[in-house]
Amino acid sequence: MSLNPRDVVIVDFGRTPMGRSKGGMHRNTRAEDMSAHLISKLLERNDKVDPKEVEDVIWGCVNQTLEQGWNIARMASLMTQIPHTSAAQTVSRLCGSSMSALHTAAQAIMTGNGDVFVVGGVEHMGHVSMMHGVDPNPHLSLHAAKASGMMGLTAEMLGKMHGITREQQDLFGLRSHQLAHKATVEGKFKDEIIPMQGYDENGFLKVFDFDETIRPETTLEGLASLKPAFNPKGGTVTAGTSSQITDGASCMVVMSGQRAMDLGIQPLAVIRSMAVAGVDPAIMGYGPVPSTQKALKRAGLTMADIDFIELNEAFAAQALPVLKDLKVLDKMDEKVNLHGGAIALGHPFGCSGARISGTLLNVMKQNGGTLGVATMCVGLGQGITTVFERI
């Protein structure tokens, strides 16, 4: 396809191996170092891109405190080959933070406010716990139930509303681990994982080029034996059907179509459309439905046009209703999360948006698809979606 000068193209994508937050490979690596390593390596393998041309580093991160505080985008950027004259900002849309980072860069390119951007995100949930420093306003309860801020309970609600059974959730969780393990064994993650040093379970320093979060030994019987994690009386959502708490970072090099043509770069894909949407916080996980419908309408497409979908697996009880109402549940094995998802790989909040987008592009490249959708729910009731076309 021919590019327009202000088209937004993805030049490359990379991510760290996903590490367990409790005693995992990244336990002695800071979030800024993880981010800087990733940015540096991605720029090294794209030597046609001059770091001096980077307009802005836009980095997603949710819990912006401790080592993730004080604008981690700038902290990480200063430790790379990107010069001090390039800017950097940290953004948060909770779970959708690094996809919002991509959207922010895309909007700048579309409006002529820069040509080259580095986007992505990080979350070290082992060093900065999910609730560290969080102090919700009690007055919020006048507008939204307190349970609406408890993501597991919103998944329980959504699953119950849509008649999702415990067995369906367990099957979905099993599928995630099986597909992620298959992708690992077949080398499907090779292009996206940028190796980095970490510590194994015995404390030895080694180079990791694989995700330590995947559990190939997972069985349906094992998942069925787990107790409900959020609603002990009558709940169906378990640790085995929820996204893992993990550490990781993801990164993309994004530029205008004109600059890519000038540099003789063959991009991976072009952004066709973007959208965000809000839903009732009580059904937080339903957000991808309206955001995807909106994005498809903006692109002049329908779901039938889409070859592959990456949906962040916050919870099986959340993902299944979304796929049902997007009319792709019966096509799941052909189109959706073909390399597994967050149940197997984990959901480091600030990292996940760029991670699922990049994984989608690799799935499209490996399977010959043309159009893809990356979408995710966002805590407190939002959805965010990007539609890509492979070049």
UniProtKB/Swiss-Prot annotation:
<dbReference type="InterPro" id="IPR012805">
    <property type="entry name" value="FadA"/>
</dbReference>
<dbReference type="InterPro" id="IPR002155">
    <property type="entry name" value="Thiolase"/>
</dbReference>
<feature type="active site" description="Acyl-thioester intermediate">
    <location>
        <position position="95"/>
    </location>
</feature>
<feature type="active site" description="Proton acceptor">
    <location>
        <position position="377"/>
    </location>
</feature>
<dbReference type="InterPro" id="IPR020613">
    <property type="entry name" value="Thiolase_CS"/>
</dbReference>
<keyword id="KW-0963">Cytoplasm</keyword>
<protein>
    <recommendedName>
        <fullName>3-ketoacyl-CoA thiolase</fullName>
        <ecNumber>2.3.1.16</ecNumber>
    </recommendedName>
</protein>
<dbReference type="InterPro" id="IPR020616">
    <property type="entry name" value="Thiolase_N"/>
</dbReference>
<dbReference type="Pfam" id="PF02803">
    <property type="entry name" value="Thiolase_C"/>
</dbReference>
<keyword id="KW-0442">Lipid degradation</keyword>
<dbReference type="GO" id="GO:0010124">
    <property type="term" value="P:phenylacetate catabolic process"/>
</dbReference>
<comment type="similarity">
    <text>Belongs to the thiolase-like superfamily. Thiolase family.</text>
</comment>
<dbReference type="InterPro" id="IPR020617">
    <property type="entry name" value="Thiolase_C"/>
</dbReference>
<dbReference type="InterPro" id="IPR016039">
    <property type="entry name" value="Thiolase-like"/>
</dbReference>
<keyword id="KW-0443">Lipid metabolism</keyword>
<dbReference type="GO" id="GO:0005737">
    <property type="term" value="C:cytoplasm"/>
</dbReference>
<dbReference type="GO" id="GO:0006635">
    <property type="term" value="P:fatty acid beta-oxidation"/>
</dbReference>
<keyword id="KW-0012">Acyltransferase</keyword>
<comment type="subunit">
    <text>Heterotetramer of two alpha chains (FadB) and two beta chains (FadA).</text>
</comment>
<dbReference type="Pfam" id="PF00108">
    <property type="entry name" value="Thiolase_N"/>
</dbReference>
<comment type="pathway">
    <text>Lipid metabolism; fatty acid beta-oxidation.</text>
</comment>
<keyword id="KW-0276">Fatty acid metabolism</keyword>
<dbReference type="GO" id="GO:0003988">
    <property type="term" value="F:acetyl-CoA C-acyltransferase activity"/>
</dbReference>
<keyword id="KW-0808">Transferase</keyword>
<comment type="function">
    <text>Catalyzes the final step of fatty acid oxidation in which acetyl-CoA is released and the CoA ester of a fatty acid two carbons shorter is formed.</text>
</comment>
<feature type="active site" description="Proton acceptor">
    <location>
        <position position="347"/>
    </location>
</feature>
<dbReference type="InterPro" id="IPR020615">
    <property type="entry name" value="Thiolase_acyl_enz_int_AS"/>
</dbReference>
<dbReference type="InterPro" id="IPR050215">
    <property type="entry name" value="Thiolase-like_sf_Thiolase"/>
</dbReference>
